[in-house]
């Protein structure tokens, strides 16, 4: 037995049509597409007010509601157009209407504000909406953000800072609003449109639909962020370009705006410059090593034996790798008077390494930062950003090799070993 479908009372339709449709200009009322936009406004009003205040009214989607309105006011379709065809054309037209909104970042630049639609299956996305006729893009963004969050971005918006994408032939532009405190109170101005408003860590949001980062860190499937996914990677790139270099400012913003070699969102939020944790901000690791190496080259080796040790160690490693083997001539052995103990010590060290093989974990724990003992006098090391850093006792170099840092060039020692 089929249950009879409850219809919207005629009195309710009369009120809604008088509020949203009958008062519009005649040239717009003759356009079925424009009428559909007004019907959409009436549908929202019906869900927000009538259904809450009048128990027993049927809950219906936009298509069923539009059919009821066109049936109640047949003069809205004077040519007798098919309602389904009109609704399909309206839906296609809506997909071509640009949408504008905002990406709101907190003061650390680590978190972003997302909104969730009212329906149970709605995902998380940025506050945005369709532009009205003859409305400026930044005005539309401010209006939509205020309607969905209750926060006015007019005083924060910059017309040149935005991410613009074309998704399914629909233009979407989101203005970037950094530096909003996390304790800001958000309160949607529209009813039954926004269910939740929350801050999310940018690092925990997915970059593509198969990115399982939110599943492991937030307990949410990546499809819950399908509306935000297209903007996450461009947002990270924008942050890296704009705030890539750390600064001493308290707000975490950079004054230089240069791009680091390997920027991370976590790095952008640091409020103070930490020299021991900087990851090559001005170029490649090779460039960083050259800058640290230059002041160390000024002091030569104390004797020739140290340089000979280094070269012999290199020859031994080349023999182990199967490369060209070099034989020590008798003359060379005679010149290396004090090298036998050092050679034996190297052999003992190699045996110890074989007995205690190096673990991969040790590479990360011990090679990340090496302590290089210096003389009693303070050495000034050239930092990556050109600022001298006083070094007394021990200095820490990020991701540098001990062999590189301890290398000292002695021309005379090399010439004697090569017998030139």
Curated annotation (Swiss-Prot):
SMART domains hit by this protein: DCP2
Gene designation: DCP2
Domain (Nudix hydrolase): residue spans on this chain: 95-226
Signal peptide (residue range): none
Tissue note: Expressed in brain and testis. Not detected in heart (at protein level).
Amino acid composition bias (Low complexity), ranges on this chain: 249-259
UniProt family annotation: Belongs to the Nudix hydrolase family. DCP2 subfamily.
Residue(s) carrying Phosphoserine: 246-247, 249, 276, 284
Record's catalysed reaction(s): a 5'-end (N(7)-methyl 5'-triphosphoguanosine)-ribonucleoside in mRNA + H2O = N(7)-methyl-GDP + a 5'-end phospho-ribonucleoside in mRNA + 2 H(+)
Keyword annotations of the record: Cytoplasm, Hydrolase, Manganese, Metal-binding, Nonsense-mediated mRNA decay, Nucleus, Phosphoprotein, RNA-binding
Chain location of the short sequence motif Nudix box per the record: 129-150
Post-translational modification note: Phosphorylated at ser-249 in a MTOR-dependent manner.
Cofactor: binding comment: Mn(2+) ion is required for highest activity. Can also utilize magnesium ions.
Disordered: annotated span: 246-266, 313-344
Enzyme Commission code: 3.6.1.62
Result, substituting residue 147 to Q: Loss of decapping activity
Binding site for Mn(2+): 144, 148
Highest taxon of the lineage: Eukaryota
Descriptive protein name: m7GpppN-mRNA hydrolase
Upper classification of the organism: Eukaryota, Metazoa, Chordata, Craniata, Vertebrata
């Amino acid at each position: 037995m089929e249950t009879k479908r409850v219809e919207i009372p005629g009195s309710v339709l009369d009120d809604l049509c008088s509020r949203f449709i009958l008062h519009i200009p005649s040239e717009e009322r003759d356009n079925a597409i424009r009428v559909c936009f007004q019907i959409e406004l009436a549908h929202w009003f019906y869900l927000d007010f009538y259904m809450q205040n009048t128990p027993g009214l049927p809950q219906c989607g936009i298509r069923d509601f539009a059919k009821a309105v066109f049936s109640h006011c047949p003069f809205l379709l004077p040519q007798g157009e098919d309602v389904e065809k009109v609704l399909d054309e309206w839906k296609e037209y809506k997909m071509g209407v640009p949408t504008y909104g905002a990406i709101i970042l907190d003061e650390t630049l680590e978190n972003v504000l997302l909104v969730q639609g009212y329906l149970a299956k709605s995902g998380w996305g940025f506050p945005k909406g369709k532009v009205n006729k003859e409305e400026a893009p930044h005005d539309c963004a401010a209006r939509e953000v205020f309607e969905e969050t209750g926060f006015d971005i007019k005083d924060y918006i910059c017309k040149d800072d935005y991410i613009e994408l074309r998704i399914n032939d629909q233009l979407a532009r989101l203005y970037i609003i950094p530096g909003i405190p996390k304790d800001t109170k958000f309160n949607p101005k529209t009813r039954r449109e926004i269910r939740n408003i929350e801050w999310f860590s940018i690092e925990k949001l997915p970059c593509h639909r198969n990115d399982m980062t939110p599943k492991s860190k937030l307990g949410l499937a990546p499809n819950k962020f399908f509306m935000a996914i297209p903007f996450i990677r461009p947002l990270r790139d924008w942050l890296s370009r704009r705030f890539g270099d750390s600064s001493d400012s308290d707000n975490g913003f950079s004054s230089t705006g240069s791009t680091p070699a390997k920027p991370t969102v976590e790095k952008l939020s640091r409020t103070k410059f930490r020299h021991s944790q900087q990851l090559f901000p001005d170029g490649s690791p090779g460039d960083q090593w050259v800058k640290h190496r230059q002041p160390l080259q000024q002091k030569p080796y104390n004797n020739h034996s140290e340089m000979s040790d280094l070269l012999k160690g290199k020859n031994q490693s080349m023999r182990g790798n199967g490369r060209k083997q070099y034989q020590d001539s008798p003359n060379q052995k005679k010149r290396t008077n004090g090298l036998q103990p050092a050679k034996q010590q190297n052999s003992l060290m190699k045996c110890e390494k074989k007995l205690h093989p190096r673990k991969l974990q040790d590479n990360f724990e011990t090679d990340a930062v090496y302590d290089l003992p210096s003389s009693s006098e303070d050495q000034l090391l050239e930092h990556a950003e050109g600022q001298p850093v006083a070094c007394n006792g021990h200095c820490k170099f990020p991701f540098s090799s001990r062999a590189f840092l301890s290398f000292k060039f002695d021309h005379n020692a090399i010439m004697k070993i090569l017998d030139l």
